């Protein structure tokens, strides 16, 4: 498991450029990065007028995820004052960093650890890959689920901010907005929410990821390496069963199937530091859903995060599940597989 690090923005003196430099250093040293917005806490050094004036700190207000309720027929909310700009980082720069942090957070998920290993061994910087991925989904000419999710993240990261505490409370007190808050449509932890939404459409996310590898870095890839990339994509798109866990359809008992690859990606990934050349051969694998595992996880998620617990959508339930149980490892989401030859 890779080490984790946390970055707070915008600290005094931070710029968009220095933030990206920090992200580059950490990502290229296999450190998983989480980005958090600076809270201007009452009594803390950076919540006092002296620091606010000294560093030109600009504030907005947002609701804390799940910190609200209706008590004695009175809607109550906990909102926080956060910093969204300083004399060295504009509000626009802050949003650029905040929105890019979603891509960084998504790629930090252990499901994409094999992609990290692949990219590294193709002599592609993990940071540069993340920037190319971001540039691709920002391009008006590109379409896909990841682009849609990124755009929705950008919209929510802007709309969650209010100029005053009173403005935030007034907005969430409206019945239709309070209902959206209850349903998790607004006011959620955006990183967890959109990571979950992304993993629920994992095949389409992988399509975009491998599109970027093959298109944006094609000048770095040999013919053999293109075959390796294609085999990697094929394997990862067949490996996980997240769709089955959160689906309603009954899993049929006889669900075995086989895939053939030009490169033995599963064996290569399982080794620590073996070169590509030892695994560049035809390989066949048999995969199938572990029905007991699917049923167990369906029941577990339903019992903990079912609709009677306030989780009205699969992505919301999955987001909470990921945050609390990802330490078990991503193999809980994998199908059973065995090598045939």
List PLM regions with ranges.
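A structural motif corresponding to the C-terminal lobe/cap of the Radical SAM core domain
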Residues: 1-129, 133, 252, 258-286, ...
């Amino acid at each position: 498991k890779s080490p984790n690090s946390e970055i707070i923005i915008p600290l005094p003196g931070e710029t968009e450029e220095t933030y990206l430099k920090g992200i580059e250093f950490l990502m290229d040293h296999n450190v998983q990065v989480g980005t958090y917005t600076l809270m201007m806490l009452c009594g803390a050094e950076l919540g006092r007028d002296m620091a606010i004036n000294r560093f030109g700190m600009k504030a907005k207000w947002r609701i804390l995820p799940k910190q609200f309720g209706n008590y004695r027929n009175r809607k109550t909310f906990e909102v926080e004052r956060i910093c969204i700009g300083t004399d060295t980082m504009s509000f626009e720069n802050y949003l650029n960093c905040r929105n890019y942090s979603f891509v960084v957070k998504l790629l930090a998920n252990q499901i994409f650890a094999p992609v990290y290993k692949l990219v590294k061994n193709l002599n592609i910087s993990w940071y540069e890959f993340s920037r190319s991925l971001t540039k691709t989904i920002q391009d008006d000419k590109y379409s896909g689920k990841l682009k849609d999710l990124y755009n929705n993240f950008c919209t929510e990261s802007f709309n969650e901010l209010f100029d005053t505490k009173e403005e935030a409370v007034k907005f969430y007190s409206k019945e239709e907005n309070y209902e959206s808050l209850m349903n998790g449509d607004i006011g959620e932890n955006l990183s967890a929410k959109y990571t979950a939404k992304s993993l629920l459409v994992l095949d389409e996310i992988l399509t975009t990821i491998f599109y970027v590898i093959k298109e944006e870095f094609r000048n770095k890839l040999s013919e053999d390496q293109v075959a390796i990339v294609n085999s990697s994509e094929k394997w990862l798109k067949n490996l996980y069963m997240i769709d089955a866990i959160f689906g309603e359809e009954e899993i049929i008992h006889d669900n075995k199937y086989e895939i053939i690859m030009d490169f033995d990606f599963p064996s290569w990934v399982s080794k620590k530091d073996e070169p590509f050349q030892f695994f560049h051969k035809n390989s066949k694998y048999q995969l199938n859903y572990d029905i007991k595992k699917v049923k167990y996880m369906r029941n577990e998620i339903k019992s903990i995060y079912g609709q009677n617990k306030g989780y009205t959508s699969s992505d919301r339930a999955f987001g909470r599940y990921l945050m609390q149980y990802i330490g078990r490892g991503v193999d809980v989401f994998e199908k059973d597989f065995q090598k045939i030859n």
